[in-house]
Amino acid sequence: MKPYVILISSASGIGKSTIASEVANTLGIKYLIETDFIRAIVRGIIGSEYAPALHKSSYNAYTTLRDTYNFKSEEELITAGYEEHASFVIPAIEKVISRCVLDNDSIVIEGVHLVPGLINIKQFEDLANIHFFVLTVDEKQHQERFIQRALAIKRGGTQIDYFKENR
């Protein structure tokens, strides 16, 4: 039987960690990893002078882009920064998936770095049961969850300032 690879993506504060944990527990999947942990490893290997976007948060990575005048809108700029940030993490995510497939182990991976179109899941389709979920919620509910989460983890002040970019 092929292993399951379940990818759960969303903006911060939507509830992907909670859902990922429930999915892993319900399906008896012993491996659950957050892309933030993978990012931390990649940051340790690639310095900020070579990858400044990687060393920012996904929601403010756009502040490191050099050619900001080439973007038609602020939304395009924010998206480009986010994709630049994620592009450093995705190869490592693909290596984690490869290892799980090789070992025939199922895994749930959750995080903001899972970007449809940037992560190449086609390479695993014959080897694993791949399921990719992108979670969304309406803006008012997201903002309420975002504030509650920021207060609970006591490190969300900056994230609240970047709610629009995070969304």
Per-region residue spans from a language model:
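Short beta-strand-centered segment that lines the nucleotide-binding/catalytic pocket of NTP-utilizing
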Residues: 29-45
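Glycine-rich phosphate-binding P-loop
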Residues: 6-27
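Loop/turn-to-beta-strand initiation segments
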Residues: 30, 103-109, 129-131
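Conserved nucleotide-sensing/catalytic segment adjacent to the nucleotide-binding pocket
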Residues: 44-105
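A glycine- and Lys/Arg-enriched "phosphate-lid" helix/loop adjacent to the NTP-binding pocket
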Residues: 126-167
